[in-house]
A protein has these predicted regions:
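A short acidic, helix-capping loop that chelates divalent metal ions and anchors anionic groups
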Residues: 186-190, 281-286, 320-322
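N-terminal helix-forming leader/targeting segments
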Residues: 1-57
Length: 430
């Protein structure tokens, strides 16, 4: 049984309704609206007793087709419904199918920078699954062309050329921009700070100017918990002092301040998410960095026979087992937060994390459990600047955005990462 809620009745067709001349199609608890095959809906309801919700407003699709009597419009509408049904079937068979999704929207045009990277690629996939149109803008300096969902439009960018990004934004005509593109290696930022201020701040400013010029309504920014620096208390709330201790965190904080001014002076509504440790994967997209600094993919290199051992940096921290504690958030949960942030009226700064911390040793032990293999670890000295414990309070996002992580357990996060890495042991081909 994939779900946890029991159902006493079959409700295949009650989700479909005519709203303002269009159709709202609802996939509810495995059932499909009456535009889809009722037998298939019955099959889903019987086989997958789960709480699975996704709402789609197709009125704009129908209008683009030319109205009720337009034959081409009707074909487009029927194809759209068939696509929704196929997506429902795919999710039911997916190991991620226990996620309860509630996405209600008019479809939007979304411009995603850094959509060839780890977080951007998964967010692009989730946006497309939810019915949005996506343009991905990426210079591929860190990302991978094959990590871009084939359903998205791809623009090879040169963010340092103001005219390029302005033209791309004008052509896409987005209602929302999701800005993931950035340099994000703390250590590198300490040796090459100019690279970080140039890309994360100056190129970000170019994007902001393009957004204002194109009259974009919403800007969602990928910030970081590194803007806080060493926290005064844990769990960390959004009102903590921001005292970054490296150019990476400083560059993100500078852009946060720019967003506040652009909202005040230009009316650009924004949400900035301060991520903790993104991890996990979907069936199609996972984590592949050319320089891998993240713990979970590095640990998984051992059972993949790509390394003999993993490393533990510091075993004398004031934590129960002496190793650093971090907060891990599943990449799908992170993507869902971004879609919630796109709603009108949502704005401000939000932490994104599970609210539970796991030590380095606990992560290694969990990877051993999931892979069924022993993972040797070499103990090394602390790395400069590593705080003992970083754990988020995401209560503000829960209260104000209606967000709630669906993968709070480390085992589930590691399991999805392991499945992806087994299928893609060398990552993306490009």
């Amino acid at each position: 049984m994939l779900g946890t809620e029991e159902r006493d009745e079959f409700d295949a067709g009650s989700g479909a309704e005519d709203i303002d001349g269009g159709f709202k199609v609802v996939i509810h608890s495995g059932g499909i609206c009456d535009q889809a095959d009722a037998l298939a809906a019955k099959f889903l309801e019987m086989m997958f007793d789960q709480n699975f919700v996704a709402e789609f407003d197709l009125s704009s699709e129908k209008k683009r087709g030319g109205g009720d009597q337009d034959q081409e419009g009707q074909k487009l509408h029927e194809a759209r419904v068939a696509g929704l049904f196929c997506n429902a079937m795919k999710r039911c068979f997916s190991p991620l199918s226990d996620v309860r999704r509630v996405v209600t929207f008019p479809p939007m045009n979304v411009f995603v920078t850094g959509g060839a990277g780890y977080i951007g690629s998964v967010c692009t996939e989730q946006l497309l699954d939810a019915g949005h149109s996506v343009t991905v803008y990426d210079n591929l300096s860190e990302g991978h062309r094959s990590a871009v969902d084939k359903r998205a439009k791809f623009v090879l960018g040169r963010p340092e050329h103001e005219g390029d990004i302005a033209a791309a934004v004008q052509e896409a005509k987005p209602e929302a921009i999701l800005h993931f593109a950035a340099n994000a290696l703390v250590g590198e930022s300490m040796t090459n700070p100019g690279k970080y201020f140039r890309n994360n701040v100056c190129n970000g400013l170019t994007l902001l100017e393009a957004a204002v010029g194109a009259k974009v309504k919403k800007f969602v920014f990928s910030s970081t918990c590194a803007t806080y620096g060493p926290p005064d208390r844990v769990p960390m709330t959004e009102d903590l002092p921001q005292r970054p201790i490296n150019p990476y965190g400083e560059s993100k904080l500078m852009f946060e301040k720019m967003l506040k001014w652009y909202e005040e002076l230009h009316g650009l509504e924004f949400v900035a998410f301060r991520y903790f440790n993104a991890a996990g994967a979907t069936e199609e997209f996972g984590e592949h960095h050319r320089i891998e600094t993240h713990l979970i993919p590095n640990v998984l290199k051992v059972p993949l026979k790509q390394k003999d051992h993993c490393e533990i940096y510091g075993t004398d921290y004031p934590t129960p087992d002496g190793t650093c504690i971090r907060d891990y958030i599943h990449i799908v949960d992170l993507a869902q937060a971004h879609m919630l942030a796109m709603a009108p009226g949502k704005k401000g700064f939000y932490n994104l994390g599970n609210g539970d911390g796991y030590s380095v040793r606990q992560v290694i032990q969990t990877c051993e459990k999931i892979t069924g293999q022993k993972i040797p670890a070499e103990e090394k000295a602390r790395r400069p600047g590593d705080p003992p414990k970083l754990v988020a309070s995401a209560q503000k996002a829960i209260n104000e955005l209606g967000w709630k992580p669906k993968f709070p357990k480390l085992e589930d996060i590691v399991s999805t990462a392991w499945e992806w890495h087994k299928k893609h042991p060398n990552g993306y081909p490009d």
